[in-house]
Each structure stands twice: as structure tokens, then as C-alpha cells.
Amino acid sequence: MAQDLSEKDLLKMEVEQLKKEVKNTRIPISKAGKEIKEYVEAQAGNDPFLKGIPEDKNPFKEKGGCLIS
């Protein structure tokens, strides 16, 4: 699709995208990193990768064994 557009059209699209992006609220990475860390630590108790899945609720647990005779 981009190949079908002229350079002028591509530049217009880029300007429109930049106009949208300039409206975004920006925060320093130090603050964003701290907020992400706090969120992850707060949600750690609900994370099955950290907490594990109870055996009775594990959908991937094998239902039966394999018997080769």
C-alpha cells in the first residue's frame, strides 16, 4: 500500500501520526520504570508463572498414564 502512495501522501501520513503522538503525556523513564516495577510487584501474587498452578486446576496435567506392555 505504501508503495502506491506519493512521497507527499507519505509525508502527510507521517505528520498526522506525529500530531497524534505529540498529544501523549510523557513522563521520565525513571518514573515510568518505578511505576512498572511497583505494578509488577503488586500483581506477583496473581501470576501463575511465579506462584504455580494447583495440581487439581492444571489444564495441562496428563489425565492418565501410558502403559506399554
From Swiss-Prot:
Positions where Cysteine methyl ester occurs in the chain: C66
Domain of life: Eukaryota
Database matches in InterPro entries: G-protein_gamma-like_dom, GGL_sf, Gprotein-gamma
Protein location: Cell membrane
GO molecular function, one term: G-protein beta-subunit binding
Signal peptide, first to last residue: none
Tissue spec. comment: Retinal cones.
Membrane topology listed for this record: Lipid-anchor
Any matching Pfam family: G-gamma
One of the GO biological process terms: phototransduction
Quaternary state and interactors: G proteins are composed of 3 units, alpha, beta and gamma.
This protein's name: Guanine nucleotide-binding protein G(I)/G(S)/G(O) subunit gamma-T2
Gene: GNGT2
